[in-house]
Amino acid sequence: MPIITLPDGTQKIFEQVVSVTQVAKSIGLSLAKAALAGEVDGQLVDTSFLIKTDANLAIITANDDKGLEIIRHSTAHLLAQATQMLYPKAQVTIGPVIDNGFYYDFVYKDGFSESDLAKIEKNMHKLVKQNLKIERFEMSRNEAIQFFKDKGEYYKTEIIESIPAGQTLSLYKQGNFIDLCRGPHVPLTAKLKAFKLMKLAGAYWRGDSNNEMLQRVYGTAWATKQDLEEHLHRLEEASRRDHRKIGKIQDLFHIQEEAPGMIFWHAKGWTLCQLIEQYMRGIFKDNDYQEVHTPQLIDKSLWEKSGHWEKFGDTMFTTSSENRDYAVKPMNCPAHIQIYNQGLKSYRDLPLRLAEFGSCHRNEPSGTLHGIMRVRNFVQDDGHIFCTPEQIQVEVSTFIDLTFAVYKHFGFDKVDIKLSTRPENHVGSDEVWDKAEAALAEALDAKVIKWEFQKGEGAFYGPKIEFVLKDCLERQWQCGTLQVDFSMPERLDAQFIDENNIKQTPVVLHRAILGSLERFVGILIEHYEGAYPCWLTPIQAVVINISGKQADFVIDITKKLKKQGLRVISDLRNEKIGFKIREHSLQRYPYILIVGDREMEKDQISVRQRGGKDLGVMSIEAFVEKINQEIL
């Protein structure tokens, strides 16, 4: 006689073993119809799952995040079924859920084309209309191996062979299609109505470049067709804002094969970077940071001592000289500790704040590189605060306020905060980690702001606070971090003399606000769609003439505006004024200054604001005052 406790505390008593579906029906037919799965004592199960003893139960529907994940996973299996119906020689491998969708990897020697995607998607919709029942059943490991061998599914067989002997495995059947899966799945294919196949890509079997290349099919799936349409609209908008497209139009940067993952900054793009750095330098100065600069190449022995070699050796660029091994720095922290170690410090010297626009290199896999968002060479607004344990909370609190202020200045008002705790492979004792995690949690609680845990996502040397921006499309970008580190300063012999004249090890707070400068520029490009705030835009105004008669006047105006500290260019080409205006409007310059005979006679300019608004005629002095007020 199981007693089922629902999320609101309501209890239902049943005379015998009961399924999740039956419990849902006892609550209401509409809930039973909407049910996709159940959560029994914290474990997700199918709606057919039988509850034999007292249990806590939540009915999972498409309105839940967990329900959406089940929809996406079930749609991945629907994709596999539809594909094998059309292409029987295609072998299935894996099909996990990812952000906003799913993918499935196939082994298919003939390869899929874009036209194949349309056929597969059409077949998926046919299977949805058939409303196939999705059923779970079990096999022993040996039975499953033989079953998939007989089907010619050698990759699936390899997966099962890697599972420890003696285990019972779950499989799912829909129509004639059977696949290995832990589940749960939706009960019927008719529950899967809002999906779209997005693209094809290559992927190595088990992520190893020595293995065979697979065909990866990406898709997206949602609870409703409206949700799907909204997502596709967001993707269209994101494509329009793609920093790679805008970067080319605005002549900001380029990337080429000879330097994969490394940026060739053009003049305007580099100006944008420098403006960001100048602003952040002011932030450093106002908050008592000492800006430093450290070497790019450092002996391997330091990276071994710091722990980076063990954790990141595979992603570090290395070289040798005079029988010594060096690594190009992937991060700046060990180098900053070397600066700290020059001269014994007193407790009166703490907190000591060091900052650097440090150029770092990481050998990211070529397949993960993406414009300036994911690169191999990047600059960080890196900083390290050396302090005592008693100073942690104040320093963390100050940094949180500072970070929010910087983001607001760049136009980001929506920021989520996450506290990432110790990963499995971490250095330092659990006692030290307990202390570090508690220090960050206390600092966050003291700020009375919303935050959430991310278990196991901390750095190998300490827990961290992550600052996640939301852009105009509600996309999330993790930028800022603050990490408490009790381990590395001890490993690298950092010390200070306390008030009792005893040597102690300082705590190091690793902190960055923007993170990768390259990535932050990419975020800004897409957030503003190239129409940056006036203080940040590489070119604030372009001066154009209507005819050749005004050429000297345009040159004179441009010089005057530059002397006032404005970033201005001129366009004296013998082109029609309409052509010039259209061309410079595409560059998203804040102002186009037009000069004709009337303006030249009165020593004035006609001002056109970004977006096409005509501000009329004004003096050069009035324009300078206007733009300065806007910047302030």
From Swiss-Prot:
Cofactor(s), names only, from the UniProt record: Zn(2+)
Region (Catalytic): 242-533
Top EC class of this enzyme: ligase
Domain of life: Bacteria
Catalytic activity line of the entry: tRNA(Thr) + L-threonine + ATP = L-threonyl-tRNA(Thr) + AMP + diphosphate + H(+)
The keyword tRNA-binding appears for this protein: yes
Keywords: Aminoacyl-tRNA synthetase, ATP-binding, Cytoplasm, Ligase, Metal-binding, Nucleotide-binding, Protein biosynthesis, RNA-binding, tRNA-binding, Zinc
Record's subcellular location: Cytoplasm
Main subcellular location: cytoplasm
Gene Ontology BP terms: threonyl-tRNA aminoacylation
Domain spans labelled TGS: 1-61
Similarity-based family: Belongs to the class-II aminoacyl-tRNA synthetase family.
Protein name: Threonine--tRNA ligase
Organism: Ruthia magnifica subsp. Calyptogena magnifica
Organism lineage string: Bacteria, Pseudomonadati, Pseudomonadota, Gammaproteobacteria, Candidatus Pseudothioglobaceae
